[in-house]
Amino acid sequence: MLEAALDALHTDWKPLIIKILNKYPDIALQLKGEYQKYKGITEIYPPVEKIFSAFSHFNQKDLKVIIIGQDPYHQMGQANGLAFSVEEGVKIPPSLR
């Protein structure tokens, strides 16, 4: 399940994230469990393959600031794994205006 999210990573974050998930397997189990628990009942945003997408845009050495968002995305197709962001062409939700 998390393999799809990791396969999408092509930066130097990938080995670090794999190392962390291997060292702390409860993190991966919790993520997988939440997605499995609600599968077929409701949608969880972002889709599992996008949960690490924030790490696909730059390498570790280029990190300057971390911004963590907490406002939920309510509509399908809005959450893309980046705080305060939607994909191009997606109507901007009220919480981001």
Where are these regions (language model features)?
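A polyanion-binding, active-site-adjacent surface
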Residues: D7, T11-R97
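GGW-centered surface loops in extracellular recognition modules
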Residues: M1-A4
